[in-house]
Swiss-Prot record:
Protein name in the entry: Histone H1.1
Residue positions, PTM Phosphoserine: S2, S12, S44, S107
Phosphoprotein keyword on record: yes
Organism whose genome encodes this protein: Bos taurus (Bovine)
GO biological process per UniProt: chromosome condensation; negative regulation of DNA recombination; nucleosome assembly; positive regulation of receptor-mediated endocytosis; spermatogenesis
N6-acetyllysine modifications at: K17, K78, K93, K125
Stored InterPro entries: H1/H5, Histone_H1/H5_H15, WH-like_DNA-bd_sf, WH_DNA-bd_sf
Domain notes: The C-terminal domain is required for high-affinity binding to chromatin.
Residues found modified as N6-(beta-hydroxybutyryl)lysine: K37, K55, K67, K88, K93, K109
Length: 218
């Protein structure tokens, strides 16, 4: 009898399952990392705020600090070790001064020198920003004012040139008129003198008339 070929077994889908498992693990790690990162200010910042808000001259005790942190919504019971580490680091940096006790136990105050140094750079930054903004604004106004002054000065120069032209033209007219009048007056005087001379010449003719009556004798 002839042998019948059996159908090949279907390919198993088992290798795909581990990949899905790996993909599922990655979001779990991301969620854990998101949980580890606390939202809001750090423990040291909360401690500094609590110490600065207190009005006690001798300093704030650890119990008072925990109460202030709990009132701010911080979980004191779970983060007790973090509070102690934050206090030690702040004392080591010099931001806090330990007035009583040793380590994390005792009372703490803000270091005034460090607080003043921290406040000065912020004030200087604000002052420099205001100076830069004012300096950037002033040149624009000055340039506009300078342009306006130049535009105002140019017509003055034009007016001055017009006035100088008018003043230079006006004296020429009387100078041209005066010599003409002076020239006419001597001409009239010269014309009068020869008339008088003609009268003197005609006088001897009247003296010769009696000679005609002399030769008549009876």
């Amino acid at each position: 009898m002839s042998e019948v070929a059996l159908p090949a077994p279907a390919a198993s889908t088992s290798p795909e399952k581990p990949s899905a498992g790996k993909k599922a693990k990655k979001p779990a790690k991301a969620a854990a990392a998101a949980k580890k990162k606390p939202a809001g200010p750090s423990v040291s910042e909360l401690i500094v705020q609590a110490v600065s808000s207190s009005k006690e001259r001798s300093g704030v005790s650890l119990a008072a600090l925990k109460k202030a942190l709990a009132a701010a919504g911080y979980d004191v019971e779970k983060n007790n070790s973090r509070i102690k580490l934050g206090l030690k680091s702040l004392v080591g940096k010099g931001t806090l001064v330990q007035t009583k006790g040793t380590g994390a136990s005792g009372s703490f105050k803000l270091n005034k020198k460090v607080a003043s140094v921290d406040a000065k750079p912020t004030a200087t930054k604000v002052a420099t920003k205001t100076k830069v903004t004012s300096a950037s604004k002033k040149p624009k106004k000055a340039s506009g004012a300078a342009a306006a002054k130049k535009s105002v000065k140019t017509p003055k120069k034009a007016r001055k040139s017009v006035l100088t032209k008018k003043s230079s033209k006006s004296p020429k007219k009387p100078k041209a008129v005066k010599p003409k009048k002076v020239a006419k007056s001597p001409a009239k005087a010269k014309a009068v003198k020869p008339k008088g001379a003609k009268v003197k010449v005609t006088k001897p003719k009247t003296a010769a008339k009696p000679k005609k009556a002399a030769p008549k004798k009876k």
